[in-house]
């Protein structure tokens, strides 16, 4: 185990267009092989599609989608004796945000056909309407936590 203590978290700079840290984190999640300008094109293109289709501010729609995707509870394995129990725990705010963004991008990538811009826009709009793969993932996570409620006293 490392002996140097905790590494300090680096602050994410807000993106230049929407001046939002959440959008900046989305861009970083979409990015592959360090191609940030391409990731920015994809995200801003997706936001333009959202503005076109909904007639609302894309940042608002994105925030709504994130709120519908971010999990409140998750299960973590805890070994007690010879058995491993899935113990439900609350998710810390930073992890909630990163999981929400990760799931949005992951399920956007899994969508068939079309460009990544369109897939990301569709996933964000679906999540804002409480449908789509990323919302289903959150619900499944919550179901797992609910099913393992009996082991909640094994928290650490």
Curated annotation (Swiss-Prot):
Cellular component terms (Gene Ontology): small ribosomal subunit
InterPro entries recorded: Ribosomal_uS7 (IPR000235), Ribosomal_uS7_bac/org-type (IPR005717), Ribosomal_uS7_dom (IPR023798), Ribosomal_uS7_dom_sf (IPR036823)
CDD domains in the cross-refs: uS7_Bacteria
Pfam family of the protein (one): Ribosomal_S7
Oligomer status and interactors: Part of the 30S ribosomal subunit. Contacts proteins S9 and S11.
Its biological purpose: One of the primary rRNA binding proteins, it binds directly to 16S rRNA where it nucleates assembly of the head domain of the 30S subunit. Is located at the subunit interface close to the decoding center, probably blocks exit of the E-site tRNA.
Protein name: Small ribosomal subunit protein uS7
Species of origin: Thermoanaerobacter pseudethanolicus (strain ATCC 33223 / 39E) (Clostridium thermohydrosulfuricum)
